């Protein structure tokens, strides 16, 4: 793929219940990198970008929560509340969950369902970059809600990209002793800053044994989190966890990927292994509250600023693993 184009378009006009936002910042994301580098989920040509914040410049008929001039952040999805999965309370699996792409643009049309449920006004003291972290943090908040972490538990996070680092911070805030695994020194240093008690460079140590050796009698961790999107890391996480422990598989792998798991161990040692995808309005709201509190700081995640015409360079630098995230800043 590797073909991103900047084109002029008409500024959108909001329909009933819709809002138009003039973006101030857009953050790069691993999903953007997958779309750009190899194609992902959608058939090109299509819009790209889903982590942005900005100012309301137009509101449609019936909009009462927002007005022109409001500083806002809009998540990229909101569930339909009508499909089978929504009625079961599994909102992340909504079959009518449209992804509102197009954050790499000066203006963005926000659909009615998002305006009503997953769009927020920024407090006066909240930076646009801070607000733009709402979407990725909401995925980490939802992910960590799918495992039980008790005070004093030991949790390993495999992969210290943006989401992995957020998992580290959230596990630390839950009172866990956190172990971070990665091969990049600057990411491991940031992991320690965010709360990791131990860091393991997987190029220097065995990723399984080194983690187990940090637990009593090498029994394994209480919770192992996979945040790399590689099938071999799913298998590694399973082997890091103790009997009766939990494995959370967050990172999405390539289509039709399979993993090998010791079924005997899973059965007799009662290991729980769970996949998790996306987020829900409840967890989007929780993420925004955490950002307002300063539990996660944009300065730890957002490294370089680019102009919109340099979006490709921003994405390439992210895809190469040279930064945690980059930021597109728009002219007034």
Model-derived regions: residue spans:
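Glycine-rich beta-strand-centered segment in the early N-terminal region that forms part
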Residues: 12-26, 39-87, 121-125
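Mid-domain Rossmann-like dinucleotide-binding core that forms the NAD(H)/NADP(H) cofactor-binding site
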Residues: 126-205, 209
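NAD(P)H dinucleotide-binding glycine-rich loop of Rossmann-like/cofactor-binding domains
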Residues: 80-158
């Amino acid at each position: 793929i590797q073909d991103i184009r900047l084109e002029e378009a008409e500024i959108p006009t909001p329909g009933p219940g819709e809002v138009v936002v003039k973006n101030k910042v857009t953050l790069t994301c691993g999903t953007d990198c997958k779309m750009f580098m190899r194609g992902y989920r959608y058939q090109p040509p299509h819009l790209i970008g889903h982590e942005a914040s900005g100012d309301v410049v137009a509101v449609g008929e019936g909009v009462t929560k927002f007005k022109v001039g409001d500083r806002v952040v809009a998540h990229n999805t909101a569930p339909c509340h009508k499909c089978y999965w929504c009625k079961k309370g599994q909102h992340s699996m909504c079959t009518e969950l449209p992804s509102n792409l197009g954050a790499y643009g000066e203006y963005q049309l926000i659909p009615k369902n998002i305006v009503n449920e997953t769009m927020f006004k920024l407090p006066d003291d909240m930076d646009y970059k801070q607000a733009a972290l709402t979407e990725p943090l909401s995925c980490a908040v939802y992910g960590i809600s799918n495992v039980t972490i008790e005070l004093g538990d030991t949790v390993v996070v495999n992969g210290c990209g943006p989401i992995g680092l957020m998992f580290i911070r959230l596990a630390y805030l839950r009172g866990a002793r956190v172990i971070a695994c990665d091969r990049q020194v600057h990411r491991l240093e940031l992991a320690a800053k965010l709360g990791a008690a131990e860091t393991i460079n997987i190029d220097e140590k065995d990723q399984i044994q080194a983690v187990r050796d940090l637990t009593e009698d090498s029994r394994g961790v209480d919770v192992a989190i996979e945040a790399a999107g590689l099938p071999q890391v799913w298998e590694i996480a399973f082997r890091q966890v103790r009997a009766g422990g939990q494995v959370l598989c967050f990172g999405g792998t390539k289509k039709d990927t399979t993993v090998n798991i010791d079924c005997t161990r899973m059965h007799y040692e009662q290991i729980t292994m769970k996949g998790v995808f996306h987020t829900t309005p409840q967890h989007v709201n929780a993420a925004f509250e955490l950002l307002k509190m300063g539990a996660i700081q944009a300065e730890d995640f957002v490294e370089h600023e680019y102009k919109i015409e340099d979006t490709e360079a921003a994405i390439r630098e992210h895809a190469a693993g040279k930064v945690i995230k980059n930021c597109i800043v728009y002219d007034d």
